[in-house]
């Protein structure tokens, strides 16, 4: 039985939590919001709260994210980010 992209996201978070400290998880991963996964292009879009979080994830956790997303989504998954800096006014920037 095939699982939904949202379920794949939940599996990803569980695997990430097993590989980082609770403080790291709460600081860097808990604020991430799953936006969508395009199965045809294998593109995963996630929302992060700031450019700093995006940069920190890329510099410090890209290997872990790649490994986990390859396992839970697709071997060809392409990670994209949307920085949502102001949810009230829906200000965002795709990275």
Report each predicted region and the residues it spans.
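Intrinsically disordered, low-complexity basic tails and flexible linkers associated
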Residues: 1-95
């Amino acid at each position: 039985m095939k699982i939904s992209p949202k379920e794949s996201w939940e599996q990803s978070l569980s695997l990430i939590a097993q590989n980082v400290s609770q403080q790291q998880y709460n600081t860097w991963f808990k604020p991430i919001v799953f936006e969508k996964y395009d199965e045809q292009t294998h593109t995963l879009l996630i929302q992060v709260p700031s450019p700093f979080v995006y940069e920190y994830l890329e510099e410090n956790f890209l290997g872990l994210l790649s490994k986990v997303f390859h396992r839970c989504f697709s071997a060809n998954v392409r990670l994209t980010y949307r920085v949502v800096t102001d949810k009230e006014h829906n200000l965002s920037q795709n990275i």
